[in-house]
Amino acid sequence: MPQSADDLQLTLQRIDGRGYKAYREIRGAFAFEGLTLYVDHVQGDPFAAPSKLRLRVPRETARIPPELFAGAVRRMALEDFLVRQAARAIRSAEPTRRGSGKSGTLLVDAGGQEVLERTAAVVSEDWVELRVQAGLPAAGRRVLGRQAEAMLCGDLPHLAEHALRWENLPQQEARDFVACVENQEQIRAQLDERGLVAFVGDGAILPRESGASDRPLRANEAVAFRSPESLRVEFPLANPVEGPDGARNVVTGMGVRKGVTLVVGGGYHGKSTLLRALERGVYPHVPGDGREWVVSDRSLVKIRAEDGRRVEQVDIGAFIGDLPQGRSTTAFSSDDASGSTSQAANIVEAVETGATGLLLDEDTSATNFMVRDARMQALVHKEHEPITPFLERVRELYERHSVSTVLVMGGCGDYFEVADTVIRMREFVPDESTQEAREIATRSPSERRVEATTPFGSITARVPLAKSFDPSRGRREVKIDARAIDLVLFGNDAIDLRCVEQLVDLSQTRAVGHAIHLAASRFMDGKAMLREVVQRVEDFFDAEGLDALDPFHRGSHHPGNFARPRGLEVAAAINRLRSLRMRQKR
């Protein structure tokens, strides 16, 4: 049974002025009017990570309409919206400094422009819950009981009142938010049957505010996207949207077809901007982002060169033949892969773990991996060049493995011969130039010779060995942390994710680290292939939710701040673990 709010106040008054560890006496549950406060974890000192609390409001108090959380997509969208409302309420409150270190801090794990499944809020049939981090007030390392009373008995009930009760929420904004996310996911569900890998809606704003901001460029500076007629498709909407001419039940825009799509155009005309939008389009976006009508197949993977990365037992023989000194590439391992070998490994690993499409930009690719022209062929004979360029494998990837490619290429017309669709960007506006590109290829045929002598065979599966995963550090049995969106600390290992470009939230990266530990401890049995292991992780997320990711999770306690990554990013992180050991399964 929870204690009363009066009990909490009395305890805080009693420990006022005592050492900081006295705050441990408030761990537990406290019943307020229409609210239960759970104090799950108390920080060790004012400078440590904030304490973990939960605010739970019963259904009859929250009174959120059930249709807003009917089904997994709507529930995820509503939970994301509630966390954003909580963050807004915290920002709008008078900033109050309540002592040393993190004293007085209130934090919720609200996201950016993407809408993700996260643990910061939970909407159940019986209650609504917000997970909060709070810096408990202190002077030096002494408890400030009165300030803590104002925070826990005043600020937090006020936060719950404004973030979890329907009567105080912006109701139309909530409905529009949920509807927008559901529309995006409905479009995504139709892409495959329509023969598409992505959709870019008419009117979308693709450019971002700056290199340091993911917010949209101001409307008066941006060019709204407009589909070429030959590529325009139409999708019905689950929820009508308001437009200048009233409500509409369909959305139109450019369909990016399966196969090989080439995006060409001059510099600064929007090629890479389009590709980046497709890269982020694997997630739904908030209303008003400009990319809420950019929807990509969930399994599209951005590929790039990655000098210096770790590669373990990957068969890159389709792209790289035997290296000097007779070094085989059918089970390639390296602690310091080159640009070309890393890009080859990135492609093979992505396909191995379920990618249905690849996104590549010439700007971040290894030139010698992408193409070898006739003059270079004449100077450096094939017997001295182990690389079979991507140009000669891109069609086989689609025809043999059903893996599509969207490639930004402004400097090499040799790709005209292998492209199914050519999109030319002019001042941020696309037009389809497939026929023109084919005519140019016919008039001016490439003089380069095809050098691939063997077909692109099957992808060699690999079995990860659990003994190579050690999450311990010092006396800690499990020490996992995410120091940045591109860095996981896993035991004594640092996993560099700078080139895994589809992670968009620090809480995703944190979840990736714990998902690796989950996979190694529960799903790696020496027989399961990496793709099977990753699928088991995805199935675990679906069945148990992200709450259970934390190895120290205790029942209903605050699980930490997690946002759901794709299995593809979990696999990418596993592949970059420096201690990783794999066994090929042929």
Where are these regions (language model features)?
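N-terminal accessory targeting/assembly segments
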Residues: M1-G195, L206, R578-R586
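Long, charge-dense accessory insertions within large macromolecular proteins
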Residues: H162-G211, P216-V223, P287, V301-R304, ...
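N-terminal pre-Walker A segment at the start of P-loop NTPase domains
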Residues: P207-T252, Y283, P287, V295-V311, ...
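Glycine-rich phosphate-binding P-loop
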Residues: N249-Y283
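Flexible beta-alpha connector loops of hexameric P-loop NTPases
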Residues: R309, F319-S340, R372-I387
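Conserved alpha-helical scaffold flanking the Walker A/P-loop in AAA+ ATPase domains
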Residues: S338-A350
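Conserved P-loop NTPase nucleotide-binding/switch module
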Residues: A350-V394, Y398-E399, G411-E439
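Conserved NTP phosphate-binding and transfer environment spanning the P-loop NTPase/kinase superfamily
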Residues: E399-S402, V408-R586
